[in-house]
């Protein structure tokens, strides 16, 4: 069973990721950026997520990829590439 400190650290990392995702979403929606710039922002979010939660690429693809796909499709008419490469 995780310790209280481990649970607090997990919550801190989740909160940080939530902030990063929300800020990125707002930037894509509200800033005059093109698809390529938005795509780079999504790649940044994925890198940050994997830095916070190593080995959780599949989780990112299940939770956040569909959200960003909808967002990019709504704004630009494009979806994310199959793989978000560096």
Per-region residue spans from a language model:
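N-terminal acidic leader/helix
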Residues: 2-35
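Helix-rich interaction surfaces within compact, conserved domain-sized segments
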Residues: 44, 49-86
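Short, solvent-exposed positions on alpha-helices
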Residues: 36-40
């Amino acid at each position: 069973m995780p310790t209280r400190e481990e649970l607090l650290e997990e919550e801190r990392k989740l909160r940080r990721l939530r902030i990063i995702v929300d800020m990125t979403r707002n930037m894509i929606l509200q800033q005059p950026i093109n698809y390529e710039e938005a795509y780079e922002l999504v790649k940044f979010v994925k890198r940050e997520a994997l830095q916070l939660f190593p080995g959780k690429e599949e989780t990112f693809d299940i939770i956040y990829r569909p959200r960003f796909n909808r967002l990019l499709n709504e704004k630009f008419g494009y979806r994310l590439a199959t793989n978000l490469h560096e």
